[in-house]
Amino acid sequence: MYYLGIDLGGMSIKAGVCNEDGVILHKDSCVTVREEDGDRIIRDMASLCLKVIADTGITVDDIAYAGIASPGSADSERGVIIYAATLPFLNCPIAARLSELTGIKKIYIDDKYFIKGSFNGLCRK
């Protein structure tokens, strides 16, 4: 079983895959390109996630869940970013959209899932 952690920031998006022991197997990042509706950011996140998964040598079906750490306020139960001052998101159903683009069935917006997906060091490139 593997976990995907995503660090969504105003300047960059980082993603990494770890195993059940919390060992980071592969990580990568891309620049956050801001657009008015935010869909470009979600598409870039999806591309980065799929790249990291492929580069790890696993498939989307091997991912137990993905966790997103995001600035601002989020409704974890609905998978929605309510507001993010540095990003163009307002009541954005990011988990559903990212799931649609990647095929990852379980995506949470909550730091505890990001941490469980283990990303000690993900932000320190």
Language model: regions and residue ranges:
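Short loop/turn microsegments at loop-to-beta-strand junctions
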Residues: 13, 69-70
